Amino acid sequence: MAGQEKESPERMEKMQLGIRLHDIKKAPLEERLAIAHEQGFACGHLALAKVISEYPVDDGALTPGYAMYLKKIFAANQLDVAVLGCYLNLANPNPASLAKNTHRYLAHIRFASLLGAGVVGTETGAVNEEYRFEERNHSEEALKIFINNLRPVVSYAEKMGVIVAIEPVYKHIVCNPSQAEQAHVRSSLTTTHWI
């Protein structure tokens, strides 16, 4: 296209390619990391419960020592953790479930900062406890609920030096890129710790 320069080979060599580690064949974590390295990836998206079955991944297990262990096995395979995934419903209408989900996000943010992962990735939930699609997910009310429940998560992320990145999914509240931008603009979340 006119006006666009072609990427130089030197610049393209600097780009780090990553993979969602749960897309690699099911195997112990160390084996998955070796496969990712062999395939030429430099970083990975780590969704703890989707990737690690040989160690606990509950909130109490996300300790500094565990983070250091994971950093070492990633480094041994010349990989970084680019994104720590946390996929829970921040619009859950059950107050106890919502509180548990929020606590889990805070634990993941803290763990991401220890891992050296600058991003915690998430989806945007549903207006029901089952985390399933219904038309109300795309309502103005649902968007307000999501933004309100996201604020303390983003505030904590800012304190921990971590970015919360949302992934629009059609079945969820934020269902496309333009709505994600609208949610960001319309909220008071002007921090750079939310994308």
Identify the function of each model-found stretch.
Residues 88-92, 127-128, 170-174:
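Short, small-residue-enriched loops and turns at beta-alpha junctions
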Residues 112-134, 160-169:
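Active-site groove signature of glycoside hydrolases
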